[in-house]
């Protein structure tokens, strides 16, 4: 098992808790072994295609993985590469996205593809800062592109990873509300095994989706004996729920959906 990665310097005054190397290696070893047994065979994880990784990462934002694969398959069938997406009209892009939710994500993918055609010969750049400069690309999407698209080491942070790292290392029961974002980011960097990002990032994501749930399945947890939150859960404490999304009817989301339906129905315009 590679040694725990040293965290990068942070401008935040909130330090990450110290993780002794032996404990870090034990956490890595157990979670990677769990992942090897429970790996989800999502196509973008093995394709080594930066574009496919970007599509999957954008589709996964605020969307359950059970739906992401449907969105991904439909999208890749219509726009199999960056030039194909860049050449499409906005109405066509939104029609393919259909009712996947948050249609601004589709528009951002479209804009990013056009930037890549204009600046990078129809390919995604490898440099992290250049990736982050693409429309709609934030730190999580950039890390997924680096990890699955290029095979580079990059620490990803999503809601599942926040929950796993926050509980195991800091002992917070509901890290999304209790653990500072800077602490989670530093932990993600510190615990990333060198050369293993393409296994480690999805291991954390899948573990948070299947075992370290909002109501954790501690009896199934392979790192229970290493988890700082386990004694609190065992003592009867519970994680305070994260506030649910507001009602749909009459909301901004409802009106955005109606506006996007009008845009989907517009005649095609393939101009740039």
List the predicted regions and their residue ranges.
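Polybasic, lysine-enriched low-complexity intrinsically disordered terminal tails
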Residues: 1-15, 246
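Extreme N-terminal tail/first-helix region
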Residues: 11-31
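Catalytic cores of DNA base-excision repair glycosylases
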Residues: 29-30, 34-254, 262-272
């Amino acid at each position: 098992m590679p040694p725990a990665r040293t965290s990068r310097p942070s401008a935040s005054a909130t330090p990450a808790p110290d993780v002794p190397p032996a404990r870090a290696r034990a956490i890595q070893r157990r979670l990677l072994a769990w992942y090897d047994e429970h790996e989800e065979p999502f196509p973008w994880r093995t394709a080594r295609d930066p574009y496919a990784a970007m599509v999957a990462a954008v589709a996964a934002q605020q969307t359950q993985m059970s739906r992401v694969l449907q969105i991904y398959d439909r999208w890749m069938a219509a726009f199999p590469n960056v030039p194909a997406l860049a050449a499409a009209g906005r109405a066509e892009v939104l029609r393919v996205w259909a009712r996947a939710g948050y249609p601004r994500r589709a528009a951002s993918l479209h804009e990013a593809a056009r930037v890549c055609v204009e600046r990078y010969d129809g390919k995604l750049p490898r440099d992290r800062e250049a990736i982050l400069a693409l429309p709609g690309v934030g730190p999580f999407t950039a890390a997924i592109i680096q990890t699955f698209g290029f095979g580079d080491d990059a620490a990803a942070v999503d809601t599942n990873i926040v929950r796993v790292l926050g509980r195991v290392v800091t002992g917070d029961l509901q890290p999304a509300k209790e653990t500072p974002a800077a602490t989670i980011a530093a932990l993600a960097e510190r615990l990333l095994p060198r050369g293993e990002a393409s296994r480690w990032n999805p291991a954390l994501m899948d573990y948070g989706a299947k075992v370290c749930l909002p109501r954790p399945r501690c009896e199934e947890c392979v790192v229970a004996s290493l988890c700082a939150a386990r004694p609190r859960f065992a003592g009867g404490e519970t994680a305070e729920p994260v506030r649910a999304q507001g009602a749909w009817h009459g909301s901004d989301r409802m009106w955005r959906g109606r506006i996007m339906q009008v845009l989907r129905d517009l005649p095609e315009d393939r101009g740039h």
